Amino acid sequence: MLYLTQRLEIPAAATASVTLPIDVRVKSRVKVTLNDGRDAGLLLPRGLLLRGGDVLSNEEGTEFVQVIAADEEVSVVRCDDPFMLAKACYHLGNRHVPLQIMPGELRYHHDHVLDDMLRQFGLTVTFGQLPFEPEAGAYASESHGHHHAHHDHHAHSH
């Protein structure tokens, strides 16, 4: 089996590719199937978020596999009003929803409850099968995540 152990800082020409959803691109140890049918194992540093276009390599530097962000079921909000888009980001972020933010557009994993909430704000929500590249904060490693005990001595409100 091919073991992919590093993400290249300067991508090389890919010899293969692998199409992965976000839920797999956040894992550091996982078995995957390359697009050519070969099995491979990801043995990557913990906390590494793979993006579409990243190139992974084996330890020997003889195989170069390009990551392709898989099409996923996402809700899509398009809006030309920055205030309304900010309002949507606020409410989705307050619910810790992994969110892809682009100029005039938001994407999140399809959820009819969230769709209905945003429609109540007057936004148009559609559905699509599209690549999903959420902000890294939604998938931060534990050492950088959002956690603390209630006995911590600082204010924090939602």
Curated annotation (Swiss-Prot):
Disulphide-bridged cysteine pairs: none
Annotated binding of Ni(2+) 1, by residue: H96
Annotated GO CC locations: cytoplasm
Single GO MF annotation: nickel cation binding
One of the GO biological process terms: urea metabolic process
Pfam family, one: UreE_N
InterPro entries given in the database record: UreE (IPR012406), UreE_C_dom (IPR007864), UreE_N (IPR004029), UreE_N_sf (IPR036118)
Disrupted-gene phenotype: Disrupting the ure1 operon causes loss of urease activity.
Major localization listed first in the record, in broad terms: cytoplasm
Subcellular location(s) of the protein: Cytoplasm
Co-factor remark: Binds 2 Ni ions per subunit.
Keywords: Chaperone, Cytoplasm, Metal-binding, Nickel, Nickel insertion
Residues that, per the record, bind Ni(2+) 2: H110, H112
Cofactors that this protein relies on: Ni(2+)
Subunit organization: Homodimer. Dimerization is prevented in the UreEF fusion protein.
Family: Belongs to the UreE family.
Function: Involved in urease metallocenter assembly. Binds about 6 nickel ions per homodimer. Probably functions as a nickel donor during metallocenter assembly. Its function can be bypassed in vitro in the presence of high nickel concentrations.
Family matches, as HAMAP family: UreE
Additional information: The artificial UreEF fusion protein binds nickel but is not able to transfer it to the apoprotein, thus its function is impaired. UreF function seems largely unaltered in the fusion.
Protein name listed in UniProt: Urease accessory protein UreE
Annotated source species: Klebsiella aerogenes
The organism's taxonomic lineage, starting at the top: Bacteria, Pseudomonadati, Pseudomonadota, Gammaproteobacteria, Enterobacterales
